[in-house]
């Protein structure tokens, strides 16, 4: 059963204006920083950050419905062996989490569905 849904749209220019390194330190946890460190292309680093931010904001919208509290670093948004994103967090242990991330040259968007485990 669907517990909650969330979506978020991020302007890449907004992240650039804040500063990529500052933004990275604000939202990424250590596991994500390890993935991020392997990225060589600057534009890919930007879309990685924007995508992670969009997923985490989407998750916050989902948990608002369930009165859960969390911060950015409580969620690891990682990639599996074929590049599909997935979430690791103590806050999601009661749910199956479905996420998708997409981006263009200007924006990144994420959509999250929290499904109650049966």
From Swiss-Prot:
The keyword Lipid biosynthesis applies. One of its GO terms (biological process) is fatty acid biosynthetic process. Its EC number is 2.7.8.7. Keywords: Cytoplasm, Fatty acid biosynthesis, Fatty acid metabolism, Lipid biosynthesis, Lipid metabolism, Magnesium, Metal-binding, Transferase. It is found in: Cytoplasm. Mg(2+) binds at residues 8, 57. It catalyses: apo-[ACP] + CoA = holo-[ACP] + adenosine 3',5'-bisphosphate + H(+). GO terms for cellular component: cytoplasm. InterPro entries: 4-PPantetheinyl_Trfase_dom (IPR008278), 4-PPantetheinyl_Trfase_dom_sf (IPR037143), ACPS (IPR002582), Ppantetheine-prot_Trfase_dom (IPR004568). It comes from the Bacteria. Belongs to the P-Pant transferase superfamily. AcpS family. NCBIfam families: acpS, pantethn_trn. This is Holo-[acyl-carrier-protein] synthase.
